Swiss-Prot record:
The keyword Signal applies. Residues 951-1000 are cytoplasmic. Keywords: Cell adhesion, Glycoprotein, Integrin, Membrane, Receptor, Repeat, Signal, Transmembrane, Transmembrane helix. Heterodimer of an alpha and a beta subunit. Alpha-PS5 associates with beta-PS. One of its GO terms (molecular function) is protein heterodimerization activity. Expressed in all follicle cells overlying the oocyte during mid-oogenesis, the strongest expression is observed in the cells covering the anterior end of the oocyte and in the cells forming the dorsal appendages. After completion of oocyte enlargement, expression in main body follicle cells is down-regulated but persists strongly in the dorsal appendage forming cells. Expressed in lamellocytes. InterPro entries: FG-GAP (IPR013517), Int_alpha_beta-p (IPR013519), Integrin_alpha (IPR000413), Integrin_alpha_Ig-like_2 (IPR048285), Integrin_alpha_N (IPR028994), Integrin_dom_sf (IPR032695). FG-GAP repeats lie at residues 15-74, 75-137, 145-198, 199-261, 262-323, 324-379, 386-448. The keyword Signal applies. Residues 971-980 have a biased composition (Basic and acidic residues). This is Integrin alpha-PS5. SUPFAM superfamilies: Integrin alpha N-terminal domain (SSF69318), Integrin domains (SSF69179).
């Protein structure tokens, strides 16, 4: 928006510095940038060294300090020893914008050979406390490396692929995405860690238990901010893992407690292979004091175009809830929008921080400036800065925008400037920012109505400037105006030229100025149509769009600010006096006194305006809300500015006696919050009103949350049988808490009570069924882990899930939950369980936290923002020890109870439970007596013999078919003659064979 359209200084890679090795390809001068008040630090990761000690080492990489005044760069030496071939020094670099801030520089490809065949790409980093001196004494340079490891999973550490210095200068982060077979990790250095002198090796955090897969690249990009709405001074960290979850990518907000890494929130990419997490920036974009997150995905595809790029904007709504918006631009394939991100501060001084986004392969490269706003980052860029040259250089594409500095005011005009690196062109471009001014202008007449005999009227144009710049020349600017009046009907005109348009220039300052114009009235026909006035304005002096020097006296105006002002006048007639006295009455109908969040996306109000007096000229209706709600629909006769709707009644014509008009105003309530909403409406006209009290109406609506919630679940493994000593078992339960809306319940407290012991009847003894140390709980809401606090039977905090430093949880008590603070729907009774499961009442022990006075329970507490149809999944496991139980009872029934509570509102929740209990029973096997077996064998043999005899008597074993065939054969022989002698042998053989067949 207010950056110079062309660079004001170009800093080229230093050619005057002598190197022994020839530079055969681009040094990537400008790959990383850190801007300071008088100089720019430039990383050139493929540069040849100027040091004699490294004269034979190829492409060590270098960092240069380039004074802003001369642009003549010098080698900023951080180390002059060891073999640093192809180490990519300057591949990542970060630091604040003051010379007293730390400077962190890394060489992620620093290689340590082990033998002739292999080595370790460990990476190495250097940091200095400040850059006050032109060159740092090498003794003041701290070197950071990792503790060597021979494990293969640590051969490609790439320490320093990303580097980040916190905004408060208290510490820094270094990414190592190659650790543990490319699972990745982050090195966190805080104030207490920065006292070491010289070189030192550090241990990488290993407690990233929630990173399960290899090749996720945790630590690829880094940032930090203040994300917690409960503790706005707690600095938390952000890292990305662009290869997580089937290459859709993730980003994490995390904290470090001791050596434990706590995951607090996860952001997800959407598109396969988009490289979500290539860059990340944490910045408060909407001015609410909570840090928001922007994550880039430069390989995001748009339609048939590949690698166009996108940025994901996550606006922090508190309680680690973020509102997501994806910004894409209509760029060509391969532009890689989002390859670099940089926070440039509030460049236009509107109270919201802004962002620079690089697309280094959009032609020779481009940088887009996005402005912050009350609702976060604006959808469209306010400015596009293209590479100064469109022709490819000797090393190919310029990659303009690959390197971006932070925003810093280097010229003292109060507005942040920006440095942009083009490593393919080996150049850095400096863009200075112009001051921003705001023009306030109005146009009005001495009276809002023209009397019948009136021949002239006076129109006044007023104007002034508003700016945060302290420069006197910025507080006084020449403005160009163009004013029009009644261009269509030409009933009036500016005197004496008798024209409907007049132009003039005027000097505007911080205090208001006005200019009067005489307007002649020529025609009184068409008196029911109002006269329109428009005043167009702009700065007279334009910023140069050429390679001229920076214009020190120029300013810019936000392009989204109004460029003209309007006014209306009307003809007054049909009234008893010069001023019409109307009687406008405003009423509403069908207004509900309460509203449930989420029940509707829009809220409608119907108004009726009636005039019972003289004609009302220039009758207008305006409406706004206490929450400054946006309007879902704007009628054609209405316009909106700053969440106030102004409507011209009766099409701009006079509203006569007895006339009425109805309007329906529709508000968008998707973002509505609070306890009440007030709608202010009013009507007015050019004349006076008999009863001004009925011209306004204030409607207050109470707001409340309401949700119907189902709590269901129970044992995963069903009933558990204890067969033998030691009578212990693992109990695993799964529960789901699902809201059916309609409202989102903010800060819902969920209590889960689990029986842990019981008191013995008739004594003071207590028997435990499991040890609290074996109790494990994990709750997820969406993809996020929900923090759980576990209180023991004395109401003392015993555990927190995920586990955290025990020193932080000592002696904290839970708040007691009163029975009338929640609504419970009918639940299952203990007697129903005994009947349904057919359990003997005298041999069954039922433990129920809600009903049994003998039951001792532990209570867990969760606080979440519960959205409709986004359930909480809770897993509970514990190991029961019932060695003492089996001698007293055969069955144990354990009821896990759930209660929910919304502080300050006892009617916002309707809880329906369907929770199945755990049933555990003692299963014993009694050995079978030997005489049972003997009697069974004897009885079996007797039964078999009896059945065989019966079948024999029934001729079951008689072969009747065989006897019949034999008889038929004998009859056949007796009826035929004997065969001849020479055939006798054969005949006998045949008979024998036939007989054999019959036998068979």
């Amino acid at each position: 928006m207010n950056f110079s359209p062309l660079p004001n200084r170009v800093i080229d890679a230093p050619k005057h510095l002598k190197t022994r090795m020839i530079q055969v390809r681009s040094s990537y001068f400008g790959y990383s940038l850190v801007i300071r008040p008088t100089s720019i630090f430039v990383g050139a990761p493929r540069a040849q060294s100027t040091l004699e000690s490294q004269g034979s080492i190829n492409e060590t990489g270098a960092v240069y300090r380039c004074p802003l005044a001369s642009g003549s760069c010098s080698h900023y030496v951080l180390n002059d020893k060891l073999n640093k071939q192809f180490q990519w020094l300057g591949g990542s670099m970060d630091g604040g914008t003051k010379d007293t801030d730390k400077l962190l520089v890394c060489a992620p490809r620093f290689f340590v050979p082990k033998n002739k065949n292999y080595g370790q790409m460990r990476g190495i980093c250097y940091w200095v406390r400040d850059t006050v001196a032109d060159t740092p004494p090498l003794s003041d340079v701290r070197t950071i490396s990792l503790i060597p490891s021979q494990a293969e999973e640590h051969f490609m550490l790439e320490l320093g692929l990303s580097a980040h210095v916190t905004d408060d200068n208290s510490g820094f982060l270094i990414g190592a995405p190659g650790v543990r077979s490319w699972k990745g990790s982050v090195l966190v250095h805080r104030g207490e860690d920065l006292a070491a002198q010289g070189s030192y090796a550090v241990k990488m955090l290993d407690s990233w238990d929630w990173v399960k897969n290899h090749f996720t690249y945790v630590g690829y990009a880094l940032s930090s901010g203040y994300f917690s709405s409960n503790n706005r001074t707690s600095l938390l960290y952000v890292t990305t893992a662009p290869s997580s979850v089937l290459n859709t990518g993730k980003a994490y907000i995390f904290d470090v407690v001791g050596e434990i890494v706590r995951k607090l929130h996860v952001f997800h990419g959407e598109q396969l292979g988009e490289y979500f997490g290539y860059s990340v920036v944490a910045e408060d974009l909407n001015g609410d004091g909570l840090t928001d997150v922007v994550v880039s995905a430069p390989l995001n595809a748009l339609g048939d175009s590949y690698d166009v790029g996108a940025i994901y904007v996550f606006i922090n709504k508190g309680l680690f809830k973020f509102e997501k918006k994806i910004i894409r631009l209509p760029l060509s394939s391969g532009a890689r929008f989002g390859s670099s991100l940089s926070k440039v501060g509030d460049i236009n001084h509107d109270g919201y921080n802004d962002l620079a986004v690089g697309a280094p392969f959009a032609g020779n490269g481009a940088v887009f400036i996005f402005l912050g706003s009350e609702h976060g980052l604006r959808d469209e860029p306010s400015q596009r800065l293209d590479a100064p040259s469109r022709e490819p250089g000797p090393y190919g594409a310029h990659m303009f925008g690959q390197g971006l500095s932070r925003g810093s005011d280097i010229d003292g005009n109060g507005f942040n400037d920006l440095a942009i690196g083009a490593p393919g062109a080996e150049a850095v471009y400096l863009y200075r920012a112009y001051p921003v001014v705001k023009i306030h202008a109005t146009v009005r007449s001495e009276s809002r109505a023209i009397r019948p005999e009136q021949e002239t009227i006076t129109v006044t144009a007023c104007y002034r400037l508003e700016t945060t710049s302290k420069a006197r020349q910025m507080q006084q600017q020449e403005l160009t105006f163009r004013m029009t009046i009644d261009e269509l009907l030409q009933r009036v005109s500016f005197a004496p030229m008798r024209t409907n348009e007049v132009s003039f220039q005027a000097q505007a300052g911080l205090s208001g100025s006005c200019r009067n114009f005489s307007v002649g009235v020529h025609y009184t026909g068409g008196i029911f149509t109002p006269i329109d006035l428009e005043l167009h304005y702009e700065l007279a002096k334009k910023i140069p769009h050429s390679h001229e020097a920076f214009c020190e006296s120029c300013a810019v105006v936000d392009p989204l600010e109004p460029k003209y002002a309007t006014g209306t006048l009307s003809f007054m007639t049909g009234c008893a006096a010069h001023v019409c006295v109307s009687d406008l009455q405003l009423s509403s109908k069908d207004v509900n006194s309460s509203f449930i969040f989420g029940s509707l996306e829009v809220l409608s109000f119907s108004y009726e305006i009636t005039n019972s007096g003289e004609p009302a000229y220039v009758a207008q209706f305006n409406v706004t809300s206490s929450a400054r709600l946006p309007f879902a629909k704007v009628p054609g006769n209405c316009r909106v500015r700053h969440e106030v709707m102004l409507c011209d009644l009766n099409g701009g014509r006079a509203l006569a006696r007895g006339d009425s008009e109805s309007l329906t105003i529709i508000f968008d309530v998707t973002q509505l919050s609070g306890q009440s909403l007030t709608i202010e409406a009013a009507v007015s006209s050019a004349g006076m009103d008999q009863n001004p009290k009925d011209n306004t109406m204030s409607t207050t609506i109470s707001l409340r949350e309401y949700a119907e919630i189902d709590a269901s679940g129970g044992p995963i493994d069903g009933h558990i049988a204890l067969k033998e000593y030691p009578y212990s078992a693992e109990v695993n339960n799964s529960y789901e808490f699902k809201s059916h809306g309609p409202s989102i319940i903010d800060e819902l407290t969920v209590y889960v009570d689990v029986p842990i012991a019981y008191t013995v009847t008739g004594s003071a003894g207590i028997k435990s069924i499991f040890n609290i140390s074996s109790l494990q709980m994990q709750a997820t809401h969406g993809s996020e882990l929900v923090p759980i606090k576990l209180y023991d039977q004395t109401n003392t905090l015993a555990k927190e899930y995920p586990l955290e430093d025990s020193s932080r949880r000592a002696n904290r008590k839970r708040r007691e939950l009163q029975q009338d603070q929640y609504a419970i729907m009918p639940d299952v009774n203990i007697s129903d369980i005994l009947t349904k499961e057919n359990l003997p009442a005298n041999r069954t022990l039922v433990l129920d936290c809600l009903r049994g006075n003998w039951t001792i329970c532990v209570r867990s507490q969760m606080r979440v923002q519960l959205k409709p149809e986004q359930p909480i999944d809770l897993r509970i496991s514990f190991k029961v020890d019932l060695n003492d139980f089996v001698n007293t009872f055969d069955y144990l029934v354990i009821f896990t109870n759930v209660e929910m509570f919304k502080e300050g509102d006892s009617t916002s929740i309707a809880l329906k439970r369907n929770l199945k209990p755990n049933v555990i029973f003692n299963y014993s096997e009694t050995p079978l007596p030997i005489w049972y077996i003997i009697l069974s064998l004897i009885a079996g043999h007797l039964l078999l013999g009896a059945m065989t005899y019966i079948l024999y008597k029934l001729r079951f074993f008689k072969r009747g078919k065989k006897e019949e065939l034999k008889r038929l054969l004998e009859e056949h022989r007796s009826e035929t003659k004997e065969p001849a002698t020479d055939c006798e042998g054969n005949q006998e053989e045949i008979n024998v064979e036939m007989h054999s067949d019959l036998e068979n």
